[in-house]
Curated annotation (Swiss-Prot):
HAMAP family assigned: UreD
General function of this protein: Required for maturation of urease via the functional incorporation of the urease nickel metallocenter.
Subunit structure: UreD, UreF and UreG form a complex that acts as a GTP-hydrolysis-dependent molecular chaperone, activating the urease apoprotein by helping to assemble the nickel containing metallocenter of UreC. The UreE protein probably delivers the nickel.
Organism: Pseudomonas putida (strain GB-1)
Gene Ontology CC terms: cytoplasm
Organism placement in taxonomy: Bacteria, Pseudomonadati, Pseudomonadota, Gammaproteobacteria, Pseudomonadales
Disulfide links within the chain: none
Name of protein: Urease accessory protein UreD
The UniProt record lists the keyword Chaperone: yes
Gene Ontology molecular function, alphabetical: nickel cation binding
Family classification: Belongs to the UreD family.
Keyword Chaperone: yes
Subcellular location: Cytoplasm
Family matches, as Pfam families: UreD
């Protein structure tokens, strides 16, 4: 029996749950993974320190993908002054299903003076998937954020379209004494009109930013051949990108990160080692 047939047979299954909680603390001049708890196949690898103080961590999603009724929760807490860079070695895959909605909820709390770089691989939604993705960021005064999110509808590299299925995506960023960002994207029935027919959408958020950073980013975006835009909402920079090619989109996000990291964090770019594989 093929993997797709096995997945479709799970329509009567309520799915499984998994959660991962991480707490980062600043100890001396180094950020440490102070505490972590997990249930199910959400895990982390051993932290890396390729640049001294910041803590680089790889989050591992279920290798078999996410199917009907699955519920995944990721909770990240950064203590004051800590700095964590989180990424993933692979994409999050939501397989097709005629069962209950698969849900991924991600919450990030940045205490005063902390820094989070959230740089995951893309979330791939197979045609026929029923998925809900919610990402919430809460920043206290002095916190800094570089975070992107990539949605891949269908598998463009395999010429597979997202011709049916549903996606409910929420992105919420709460800033102290500012409006922040709250946006929701709903895709149903395989209609990609909201994305101009593009199967790939990326959102890159950075805070705190200013007009000079906005102009720097816009100069880079002007070089692209794909639809892209950048907006400054108070001190929150929001960049949106559309594409048909995932590798091109990932390269664009990394180029933006190389610009924004020195501008926002005052640090030179130190790419995660996994990006080179």
């Amino acid at each position: 029996m093929s993997l797709a047939e096995q997945i479709e047979q799970q329509q009567g299954d309520a799915g499984w749950s998994a959660h991962l909680q991480l707490r980062f603390v600043q100890r001396g001049d180094v950020t440490r993974l102070g505490a972590w708890k997990h249930f199910g196949p959400l895990l982390v690898q051993r932290p890396f320190y390729p640049e001294g103080s910041p803590c680089h961590v790889y989050v591992l999603h279920p290798p078999g993908g996410i199917v009907a009724g699955d519920r995944l929760e990721l909770n990240i807490h950064l203590e004051p002054g800590s700095h964590a860079l989180l990424t993933m070695p692979g994409a999050s895959k939501f397989y097709r299903s005629i069962g209950p909605t698969a849900r991924l909820t991600q919450r990030f709390h940045l205490a005063a003076g902390s820094t989070l770089e959230w740089l995951p691989q893309d979330s791939i939604f197979f045609s026929g998937a029923r998925a809900s993705l919610a990402s919430r960021f809460s920043l206290e005064p002095g916190a800094r954020l570089l975070a992107w999110e990539t949605l891949c509808l269908g598998r463009p590299v395999m010429h597979e379209r997202f011709d049916h299925g549903t996606l409910d995506s929420l992105l919420h960023i709460e800033l102290p004494d500012e409006v922040g960002l709250h946006e929701r994207l709903r895709i149903a029935g395989g209609h990609l009109d909201k994305l101009g027919g593009h199967p790939l959408l990326a959102t890159f958020c950075a805070a705190p930013a200013d007009q000079a950073v906005l102009e720097q980013v816009r100069s880079l975006l002007d070089e692209l051949g794909n639809p892209a835009g950048a907006t400054l909402l108070g001190s929150l920079l929001v960049i949106r990108l559309l594409d048909h090619d995932n590798q091109h989109l990932q390269r664009t996000l990394q180029r933006l990160w190389h610009v924004l990291r020195p501008a926002i964090l005052g640090l030179p770019a130190c790419p995660p080692r996994i990006w080179a594989t």
